[in-house]
From Swiss-Prot:
SMART domains: S4
Protein name per its UniProtKB record: Tyrosine--tRNA ligase
GO terms classed as biological process: tRNA aminoacylation; tyrosyl-tRNA aminoacylation
Molecular-function GO terms, alphabetical: ATP binding; RNA binding; tyrosine-tRNA ligase activity
Catalytic reaction equation(s): tRNA(Tyr) + L-tyrosine + ATP = L-tyrosyl-tRNA(Tyr) + AMP + diphosphate + H(+)
Chain ranges of the S4 RNA-binding domain: 341-402
Main location group: cytoplasm
Subcellular location(s) of the protein: Cytoplasm
Length: 403
């Protein structure tokens, strides 16, 4: 494949390539010498399950594998114990070594549903970071100033608002950057929220006399609410280890616009095919539900196999036929919180009933369903995260999104 064709594939879905000309030169050199580029992406095992948001990077890594390059799946077992402060307004709670290692094992099992195990190097950053003594850590810290760290948006805001910033949080970008030095990475992939850290890696490589890595930032996949990035803590995620029926059903619940976004970042369809689908939805020649089914089949098949994808679609169609959930319904957006909210209250706020007491009676009488499942507990409380489709009677629906 020509360098131009490689660049076209690499650029798909990417937000930024720093520096694009450098990447072209690296690809040209690789083609001439036959030496593959080292492509690095790091994942801190702070939770046991990967979700579709993580797979945006994994799909880009797979594309590099298909182009013949070496992919390094870096598990941040050392940095995971620090906790990435990116985007946080307060210091994150550190995980124990045992928690990190347990989560890391599940990561290794899950990533090979996407990556080719024969072409993937799995590395743990404790291999080199645990060997850094006090002198080495001080030497690393000397490479950057506090003023430069405060240029990072989240640190700057916390400092301006007189919120505490722990010293170890300043070390995180340096340690992540040092990973690139240890691996001699040619390219590092990361979400747009990681741009500062990725650029630190470039600077540290220059300090160590290495060719600076090319940085490719990928978008943060929106969760089911279409607003916030996909996150387990927000409840708006699709885990790749979830049952096939749940994955398919969640994909069918997203908006049409978000569906097209998922196609671009998660599917193997070409951009021309996706653009054709977008046009078809606009002119009415493509029904959005059929397009979502196609996406659901592709995603489920990737993680559970083609047979499971077919079964999941059939299960959804039967449930949809029985429930007759409409495409259009009243929508209500509420603030996501850590608290739970009573279902009877949601019925009233969505305008499906006139009062909380009427909502409780409706639940008692078996006239209420949540996401297609009938409920009978009048005291039921729901987590104030994610998306719920609430049905009252046969024809009254509301979609409630916590964002």
């Amino acid at each position: 494949m020509s360098v131009a064709d490689q660049m076209a594939l690499i650029k798909r879905g990417a937000v930024e390539i720093l520096v694009e000309k450098e990447l072209e030169e690296k690809l040209e050199k690789s083609a001439k010498t036959g030496v593959p580029l080292k492509i690095k992406a790091g994942f801190d095992p702070t939770a046991p399950d990967l979700h579709l948001g993580h797979t945006v990077l994994l799909h880009k890594m797979r594309q590099f594998q298909q182009l013949g390059h070496e992919v390094i799946f870096l598990i941040g077992d050392f940095t995971g114990m620090i906790g990435d402060p990116t985007g946080k307004s307060e210091t994150r709670k550190a995980l124990s070594r045992e928690d990190v290692l347990r989560n890391a094992e599940t990561y290794k099992e899950q990533v090979f549903k996407i990556l080719d195990p024969e072409k993937t190097r799995v590395a743990f950053n404790s291999e080199w970071l645990a060997k850094l003594d006090a002198g080495g850590m001080i030497g690393l810290a000397a490479k950057y100033t506090v003023a430069r760290m405060l240029e990072r948006d989240d640190f700057g805001k916390r400092f301006a608002n007189q919120l505490p910033i722990s010293i170890h949080e300043f070390l995180y970008p340096l340690i992540q950057g040092y990973d690139s030095v240890a691996l001699q990475a040619d390219v590092e992939l990361g979400g747009t929220d990681q741009k500062f850290n990725l650029l630190v890696g470039r600077e540290l490589q220059r300090e160590w006399g290495q060719t600076p890595q090319t940085v490719i930032t990928m978008p943060l996949l929106e969760g089911l609410d279409g607003v916030n990035k996909m996150s387990k803590s927000l409840g708006n995620y699709i885990g790749i280890n979830e049952p096939a029926d749940e994955i398919f059903g969640k994909i069918m619940s997203i908006s049409d616009e978000l569906m097209l976004r998922y196609y671009e970042l998660l599917s193997d369809l070409s951009m021309a095919e996706i653009d054709g689908m977008r046009t078809g939805i606009r002119d009415g020649s493509v029904h959005p539900m059929e397009a979502k089914k196609q996406l659901g089949r592709e995603v489920v098949a990737r993680y559970h196999g083609a047979a499971a994808a077919t079964d999941a679609e059939e299960h959804f169609v039967k449930r949809f036929r029985d429930n007759q959930t409409p495409d259009e319904m009243p929508e209500l957006t509420l603030a996501a919180t850590d608290e739970k909210v009573a279902l009877c209250r949601l019925l009233a706020e969505a305008g499906l009933v006139k009062s909380n007491s009427e909502g409780r009676r409706a639940i008692q009488q078996g006239g209420v369903k949540v996401n297609g499942e009938k409920v009978s507990d009048e005291s039921l409380e729901l987590a104030a995260t994610g998306v719920y489709v609430i049905q009252f009677g046969k024809r009254r629906f509301a979609r409630i999104t916590f964002a």
